[in-house]
């Protein structure tokens, strides 16, 4: 099974997991459409992977997201949502607006993508959401993100029933060595990498390419829906 002749939309496709998924999907014959906030970064990503098109907008802007899908000229087979990310802040240091934004970038974004993409998606196509294992591994700096990611498995299962025959699956990732991780950790990045190499059962850090391989697998296997797939190198067991 491959993606020959299919259209894959990457919501958050200019770097990291989204970009790697675009590269892998294009290699399997898909037409890829990249979205992100920065037109400059999208242009570089498009040249890298040979994207069919790019569109710059903020995916958390519901109206812009809806217009994006409405303006697509052709049907879509698969959508991967990687926009959004963790916020390393204790809950008591966050304002109510900070908390709303963090929750929105996880649960609400996935729902709005599903709502906007549904009219353009082919039956049997798939929506792949990104979450994490934080709901099972509590960190005092990730309380809100942990709460949001813990809600995503039942959210995904219910959405799969509502969207059927469009399939919906969730990738629950641990630490992934992405540009976003580098930006969030700053000077602590190398120490974090070294720690994971020493402690993870796989003996190395999970890469964007690892997650991209899983994302494409969820797209091409038509029997998979409503499920959550962990990819953390065994991090949750240590």
Write out the residue ranges for each language-model feature.
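Substrate-binding pocket helix/loop in short-chain dehydrogenase/reductase
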Residues: 90-91, 98-103, 192, 196
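Conserved Rossmann-fold SDR core element
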Residues: 153, 162-177, 224-231
């Amino acid at each position: 099974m491959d993606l020959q002749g299919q259209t894959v939309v990457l919501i958050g496709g200019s770097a990291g997991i989204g970009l790697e998924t675009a590269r892998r999907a294009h290699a399997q014959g898909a037409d890829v459409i990249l979205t992100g906030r920065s037109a400059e970064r999208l242009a570089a990503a498009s040249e890298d992977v040979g994207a069919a098109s790019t569109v710059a907008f903020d995916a958390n802007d519901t109206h812009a997201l809806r217009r994006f899908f409405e303006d697509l000229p052709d049907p879509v087979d698969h959508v991967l949502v990687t926009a959004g990310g963790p916020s390393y802040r204790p809950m008591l240091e966050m304002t109510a607006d900070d908390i709303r934004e963090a929750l929105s970038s996880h649960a609400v974004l996935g729902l709005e993508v599903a709502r906007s993409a549904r009219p353009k998606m082919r039956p049997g196509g798939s929506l792949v959401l990104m979450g994490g294992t934080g709901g099972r591994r509590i960190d005092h700096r990730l309380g809100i993100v942990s709460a949001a990611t813990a809600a995503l498995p039942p959210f995904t299962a219910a959405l799969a029933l509502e969207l059927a025959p469009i399939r919906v699956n969730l990738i629950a990732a641990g630490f992934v060595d992405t540009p976003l991780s580098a930006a969030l950790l700053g000077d602590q990045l190398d120490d974090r990498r070294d720690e994971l190499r020493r402690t993870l059962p796989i003996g190395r850090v999970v890469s964007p390419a690892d997650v991209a391989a899983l994302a494409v697998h969820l797209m091409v296997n038509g029997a998979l829906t409503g499920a959550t797939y962990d990819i953390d190198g065994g991090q949750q067991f240590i």
